[in-house]
Each structure stands twice: as structure tokens, then as C-alpha cells.
Design a protein with these regions (language model features):
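Extracytoplasmic cell-surface/polysaccharide-interacting catalytic and binding patches
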Residues: 17-236
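Bacterial Sec-dependent N-terminal signal peptides
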Residues: 1-26
Length: 236
């Protein structure tokens, strides 16, 4: 009798553990939402609280931080990916394989975006509400409209746990430098560690993702090494 009870408890534990792991992977891949807070801009709760503190500190220094983009689910990332794929292959007449590499200069394959985690934010200056195409690198450089914000973040963001994800280290490969993209390290480092346990091939080799037939084993290995892992060393 005791053996049966112990076996039952073991099976229940295994089932709960499996369900939790599955849920975690679904969150990391953007299929399910993490514990998000916020109105129109949603973030993981610790990230949300840390950003609010940073925003107040910046305001006290005369700098107005605004989040241009935060959490992004799988379906949204898939729409971005497929729209770009269609544009590059029809308007710009790129070969499908070329389109894939053009997209991953700045955009991730659905299921692999750090924005799925709710720990990533794209930051701009709130004083330019009518500005279009805000996520342009030159706008964050000297004489650019977001230089004031960028300069403040360079000095202060790490005090609040935010690190630029794709920095301008000349030795770094993968995604282009994004001066607007910051990650809340205390949570995102844990998220990355969990994400690396997933089967990347199963995550991205889906018919609904345009161009996925070009995701060969060599491509997937390169994507993992250079795009997922070649980030700011302080986020590993």
C-alpha cells in the first residue's frame, strides 16, 4: 500500500514538474505571457518596477524616458517576420535565403525574441510624440533627437539593472547594434539560462514562419551562437 502511495506521489510530482517546465518554455517562446503588468506597455513585474524607478530618476535630471516597445508575443513577432520576408522577396526581389539574413540584422525569428520575456525595452525620448521611425541608430548619436536620452542611459542605466543588449563591441557578431534596446539583467539572465535548455530546431522550424525551410542545422547552430548568445557579456 505504501509503495502504491509513494509511486502515486512520485508520478504527481513528475507531472507537476513537467507542466511547470512546459509552461516556462511556452513563456520563453512567447506562446504564453509571463506575469505582465502595465497598461498599453506591458512588462514582467520586476522589470516594470525597476523601469519606473529609473524613469523617475531620469525625470529628476530633466530627461524624459519613454518605452517605445516592450513585451511582444509570438504571434506579433511572427507577423513582423512574415511581413518583412514578403517585403524583401517581392519588393526588393531578394532570394528567400537572402531575405532571411536581411531580416535577422535587426529582427529575431519568432519564438526566440528576448521581447517575449517581458524584460526587454526599447527606450526613446517622450518629447517627440509625432516622430516616425524612432528606432534609427543615427537618432541616438550626437545631434540626434534621442542623444540626450542615450547619454543619460550610458551613465545611469546599469544602476537600475538595465544593460544594453546588442552593444557596439566591434568583436560582437549577430544582430546589429541597437542603442535603444535595454534588458533588465536580474531577470533576463535567468530567462536566457532557461531558454537555452529548449530545442531550438523545434522552436523555429515551423511552416507558419516564412523561409523556415532555409533554417538548416548549420544555420540554427550559427543563429544560436552569434545571434542568441553573442550579446552584452553582462547579460550572460
Amino acid at each position: 500500500m505504501n509503495l502504491n502511495i509513494n509511486l502515486l506521489l512520485f508520478l504527481i510530482f513528475c507531472n507537476i514538474n513537467f507542466s511547470q517546465n512546459s509552461m516556462n518554455l511556452d513563456i520563453l517562446q512567447g506562446i504564453k505571457n509571463p506575469n505582465l503588468v502595465g497598461d498599453t506597455i506591458k512588462l514582467e513585474k520586476n522589470t516594470f518596477n525597476a523601469f519606473n524607478k529609473m524613469q523617475i530618476a531620469a525625470k529628476n535630471d530633466g530627461v524624459d524616458l519613454k518605452i517605445a516597445s516592450a513585451h511582444r508575443g509570438y504571434d506579433r513577432q511572427k507577423l513582423i517576420w512574415n511581413t518583412k520576408f514578403k517585403k524583401f522577396t517581392t519588393e526588393f526581389k531578394l532570394k528567400p535565403s537572402q531575405a532571411v539574413y536581411e531580416i535577422i540584422r535587426f529582427s529575431t525569428i519568432p519564438g526566440t525574441s528576448r521581447h517575449h520575456w517581458g524584460t526587454e525595452i526599447d527606450i526613446i525620448d517622450s518629447n517627440y510624440p509625432d516622430e516616425e521611425d524612432v528606432l534609427i541608430s543615427k537618432k541616438f548619436e550626437k545631434d540626434g533627437i534621442f542623444f540626450k536620452v542615450k547619454n543619460w542611459l550610458n551613465i545611469n542605466s546599469e544602476k537600475f539593472g538595465f544593460y544594453i543588449t546588442y552593444n557596439n563591441d566591434p568583436k560582437r557578431k549577430g544582430f546589429e547594434h541597437e542603442p535603444w534596446h535595454y534588458s533588465y539583467a536580474p531577470i533576463s539572465k535567468k530567462m536566457l539560462s532557461l531558454f537555452l535548455k529548449s530545442d531550438l530546431k523545434k522552436v523555429i522550424k515551423k511552416e507558419e514562419i516564412k523561409g523556415s525551410e532555409y533554417f538548416t542545422d548549420n544555420f540554427i547552430e550559427k543563429y544560436k551562437k552569434e545571434y542568441i548568445l553573442d550579446i552584452n557579456k553582462d547579460l550572460k
